[in-house]
Amino acid sequence: MDTVYIETSIVSHATAWPSSNPATAVLQDQAKRWMSEQRSKFNVVTSRLVLDEAAKGDPDAAKRRLAMLADIPVLEPNPDVETVVEQLVSRSLIPETARLDASHVATAALAGVQFLLTQNCRHIANATMLPRVYRLLDELGLPGLLIYTPAEFLGGTDDND
C-alpha cells in the first residue's frame, strides 16, 4: 500500500468552517472528500511540523485539526531535512520565506513516501516548479516522491464514467 504524507493545508481545509469564498469552498470539499473517500486506500503519515502548525491559531480550529491528525502516525525527525531544505531554497525552488513548506517536501522525500498531499499550490504543488523539484530530489538520491492535490486523486467533476 502506498504512503501519503498529509501536509497542514489538508487538515486546515478539511476541518474549517464552510467558506463563503467559492474557491476556498471547493478546496474544503476536496480535502474532506479525500479524507473520507481516499484515506483508507493508503498508509497515511504526517510530521511534527504538521502537528505544530495545526496547533496554532484559533483554539477551537486547532482542536479540530489536531483531532483529525490524532490517529495518523508521525514520522520520526530526520537530521538531513535541513540539508534538503537548503538545496530547495538555494536553487530558488521554494522561497526563503517558505522554508517550512520546503521542510514538508524534504520530510516526505527523506521518509520515502510515495505522495505528499497538499493544497498549497504556491510553494509546494506549484506546476512550474515541480519538474525542477523532482529533478533536485533525484539528484539528491531521493526519487519517487509525487506531490499532488486531493483533486488529482478524486478525478474531475465532468467525468461521465
Name each model-derived stretch.
Residues W17-N21, A25-Q28, A109-D161:
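Acidic, PIN/NYN-like endoribonuclease modules and their adjacent C-terminal/linker elements
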Residues N43, P73, G144-L146:
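Conserved beta-strand segments of alpha/beta enzyme cores
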Residues R48, N78, A151:
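Residues at the C-termini of beta-strands that transition into short coil/loop
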Residues M1-T46, A55-R64, S90-E96, L130-V133, ...:
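Short, well-structured N-terminal submotif of metal-dependent ribonuclease cores
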Residues R64-A67, P73-P77, T149:
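Extended, non-globular alpha-helical segments
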Residues D71-R132, L154:
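Active-site neighborhoods of divalent-metal-dependent phosphate/nucleic-acid chemistry enzymes
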